[in-house]
């Protein structure tokens, strides 16, 4: 049963660095069990003030979860408000956390930045 729970919510992350971008996302891959907290970090390109977190689900659909300008939230989905936590402090990596993982969280999570 423990193995089944462990494989319940596999979270894949794409390190943008592999595309020669200046955005760094860690960790590169996560596997979490149901109910576990999950945290991902994103270091935007130097000088960029906008940060975006996206989720690409198993149907290959992209959805913006949250966006920041500097430390302020610009857009936030209802799903993010209910199940996620994010922050983007000055001079530190931005983070995206899933408060309690569920099987439906199996997805590719992407961070992007712009000026």
Swiss-Prot record:
One of its GO terms (biological process) is adaptive immune response. The keyword Translocase does not apply. Its main location: membrane. The keyword Transmembrane does not apply. This is Probable non-functional T cell receptor beta variable 23-1. PANTHER family: NON-FUNCTIONAL T CELL RECEPTOR BETA VARIABLE 23-1-RELATED, T-CELL RECEPTOR BETA CHAIN. It comes from the Eukaryota. It comes from Homo sapiens (Human). One of its GO terms (cellular component) is T cell receptor complex. Disulfide bonds join 42-111.
